């Protein structure tokens, strides 16, 4: 892996770091102070999910770090956190393959400990220890230092997911999707090598790993996938494991590929559009923004749909 295009490579001074990632306040050097910049809660709208949302200023610094990390050339199988690639592109790679096997890594970001991130900055980007420490502080969060409104819900989530790392890759940071790959290159490369040797296409989109082939993906391959993931101390979410055969539509990172491999909008997305249309009268501004987001996602799959409604939502 070539890291030389990344301006964070071999950074040794705070002055240089401050200039590159636009740090305006020294409080962003210390994790104890950075922790106060997070709003931590459990989102229960769809399924329980740990949210660690950074403040506006912290998020701007994280975006600057992401900008530099995006200069690192990653393999074609990586789709999350990569400029110019999306969940839609990730799904299209598997178009035409009859068999699909999907896995989801359980609570992936919270399972990536601070140490992994620190070792990436110091060993791979060759920064000095103090710079590696600052960059790690900016991209991870220590929940023991955060002001959490509902601690009990967070503790319950941790118990249910059997999580151990209170200090981990921050779920709401713009840097997390690409860092989740960069700190786990050995695992993902091992999965990719297994796939390549068996004529299987593999892609990763954050915690979603998708395998597809024109031939049936054997039980032995699936067992090997599980062994590799377990070897690196991660877990596969059993309820989210999906196998699709040639006669069924395939759902990949939110995109449905029909029996012929063509992308089609999900029925749930259409239902959400109908719901937002009825909500327009009650909450016009909020509903209009949500409607625009939904229609943008649908039109990415089918550009011809909802043309007039899309124009209205953009006004």
Predicted segment positions?
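Right-hand nucleic-acid polymerase module
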Residues: 1-133, 137-173, 181-193, 217-315
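Catalytic palm active-site di-aspartate
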Residues: 102-106, 172, 176, 197-214
């Amino acid at each position: 892996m070539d890291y030389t295009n990344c301006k964070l490579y071999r950074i040794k001074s705070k002055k240089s770091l401050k200039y590159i990632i636009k740090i305006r306040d020294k409080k962003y050097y210390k994790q104890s102070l950075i922790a106060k910049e997070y709003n931590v809660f459990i989102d229960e709208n769809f399924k329980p999910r740990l949210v660690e949302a950074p403040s506006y200023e912290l998020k701007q610094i994280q975006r600057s770090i992401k900008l530099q990390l995006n200069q690192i050339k990653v393999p074609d199988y990586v789709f999350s956190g990569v400029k110019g690639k999306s969940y839609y592109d990730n799904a299209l790679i598997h178009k035409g393959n009859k068999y699909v096997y999907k896995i989801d890594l359980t609570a992936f970001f919270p399972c990536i400990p601070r140490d992994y991130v620190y070792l990436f900055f110091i060993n791979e980007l060759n920064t000095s220890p103090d710079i590696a420490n600052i960059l790690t502080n900016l991209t991870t969060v220590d929940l023991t230092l955060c002001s959490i409104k509902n601690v009990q819900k967070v503790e319950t989530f941790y118990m249910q997911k059997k999580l151990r790392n209170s200090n981990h890759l921050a779920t709401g940071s713009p840097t997390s999707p690409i860092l989740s790959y960069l700190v786990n290159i050995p695992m993902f490369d091992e999965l990719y090598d297994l796939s390549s040797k068996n004529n299987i296409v593999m892609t990763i989109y954050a915690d979603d790993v998708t395998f597809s082939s024109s031939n049936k993906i054997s039980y032995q391959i699936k067992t090997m996938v599980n062994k590799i993931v377990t070897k690196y101390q991660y877990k596969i979410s059993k309820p989210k494991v999906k196998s699709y055969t040639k006669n069924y539509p395939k759902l990949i990172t939110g995109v449905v590929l029909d029996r012929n491999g063509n992308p089609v909008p999900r029925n749930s997305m259409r239902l959400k559009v109908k719901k937002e249309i009825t909500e327009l009268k009650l909450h016009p501004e909020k509903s209009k923004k949500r409607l625009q987001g939904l229609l943008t996602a649908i039109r990415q799959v089918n550009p011809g749909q909802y043309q007039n409604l899309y124009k209205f939502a953009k006004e």
